[in-house]
Regions:
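Short, glycine/acidic-rich beta->alpha junctions
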Residues: 13-18, 121-125
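Conserved class I S-adenosyl-L-methionine
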Residues: 31-95
């Protein structure tokens, strides 16, 4: 079961009901994914949400939009921060608040309303939510943000303190505090883990991986919630070179690279996190191609009508890949006019949607042409 972006935006009784529904619906060993805003990362946003909610309530009978209430609250808070050279007590206590307020003008209005104009808005702590989940026999298993499962990737100055903690829940708390965690993507399992270590290893070694979108690069920096992680270029390039020949199992990769299971799991997790590698679904992926093509056709139509859908379903990996509105316009232009210049179609399409490019049309078209072959391998068709 999946509950993405719900738990921290609803009242406590509804949050407990979500957990109960998950627990009652899953068989033993079934998985429940739940993502939510968390503390301490959202502390700086608390004053903004408080004022935005009050502003929206005060303006409820007027004609201004809910998004305007958020911007009005932000303007008021700016006046409470003082100057950068002479910050107020609030600005010193919440140094991230000024930057957050400055970023609002770049955010979509629908997101601002959904995020801040919400009576049930309440960033959660990991210990409180995990305790609530355990009360429903939902046991924390792992983070869907794969790098978060490897505390050895933490910066050196905080790593030892986190890894020295033996209690799993306390270790999660320490990790969240150390990195100022703002959003968790937790996976829970129903009941107890019935797999032995040998069974877990066998399942892992049988998994197959494939090259996804992996343009050549000299270095391997990975942006994670721990900060920037720099991978060993020779090692990561070797993995991609092997996978360029086609999908490979974990066991084969381990043998060819002479890596331990934990080390290879970390390498693959970072490549998966960065979208350079995918989990190959084999025959199941082939069987899902037609359905994914149908979904992509609908997503394309909605995207071209201005809806905020910026991903496409990729059947071979059972996941989604980014696909911008500019790429959707160029894809449609190519289907309608073959190999002619699509610059005009791109510009007109963006103008009609009230959108602009951050780069030149020529650069965007060149990037799309370079990406088309990689996308074709992922079978991102529309039928």
């Amino acid at each position: 079961m999946v509950a993405h972006g719900i738990a921290a935006w609803v009242a406590q009784p509804i949050r407990h009901a979500l957990l109960k529904v998950a627990a009652d619906s899953l068989i033993a060993g079934g998985l429940y994914y739940c993502s939510y805003n968390t503390l301490p990362g959202w502390l700086a946003a608390c004053p903004l949400q408080q004022l935005a909610w009050l502003e929206s309530r005060r303006r409820a009978s007027g004609t201004t939009s809910a998004a305007q209430a958020v911007h009005a609250a932000a303007a008021t808070l700016q006046g409470l921060l003082g100057l950068a050279e002479t910050p107020s007590a609030l600005a010193m206590a919440l140094p991230g608040l000024r930057e957050r307020l400055g970023s609002l003008k770049e955010m979509d209005s629908s997101y601002l309303v959904q995020e801040y104009i919400n009576e049930g808005w309440q960033p959660l702590t990991v210990q409180d939510f995990h305790d609530s989940a355990m009360a429903h026999k939902l046991r924390y298993t792992a983070s869907a943000a794969l790098p978060d499962n490897f505390p050895g990737l933490l910066p050196v100055n905080i790593r030892d303190t986190v890894m020295a903690e033996a209690d799993p829940l306390v270790r999660e708390v320490l990790q969240d505090l150390a990195i100022n965690q703002s959003f968790r993507r937790d996976i829970f399992s129903r009941g107890v883990d019935t797999l032995s270590s040998a069974e877990n290893t066998a399942l892992l070694q049988a998994m197959h991986f494939c090259l996804q979108e992996a343009p050549e690069q000299e270095s391997y920096p990975f942006t994670t919630s721990f900060g920037l992680v720099n991978g060993n270029s020779n090692l990561y390039r070797s993995v991609e070179t092997i996978l360029a020949d086609g999908p490979m199992s974990f066991a084969v990769l381990q043998d060819r690279l002479s890596l331990s299971i934990p080390d290879l799991a970390q390498v693959l997790s970072l490549l998966l996190h960065d979208g350079r590698v995918g989990i190959d679904r084999g025959e199941a992926g082939k069987a899902a191609t037609s359905a994914c093509n149908s979904v992509n056709k609908t997503l394309s139509r909605l995207q071209l009508n201005g809806r905020p859908y910026n991903f496409r379903a990729a059947a071979p990996i059972g996941s989604a890949v980014p696909f911008s509105i500019a790429e959707a316009l160029l894809e449609t232009a190519a289907e309608n006019s073959g190999g002619s210049d699509h610059r005009e179609a791109l510009i007109k399409g963006l103008d009609a949607l009230g959108r602009t490019l951050v780069d030149t049309p020529e650069a965007v078209m060149e990037a799309y042409q370079q990406r088309r072959y990689r996308l074709q391998k992922l079978e991102l068709g529309r039928s």
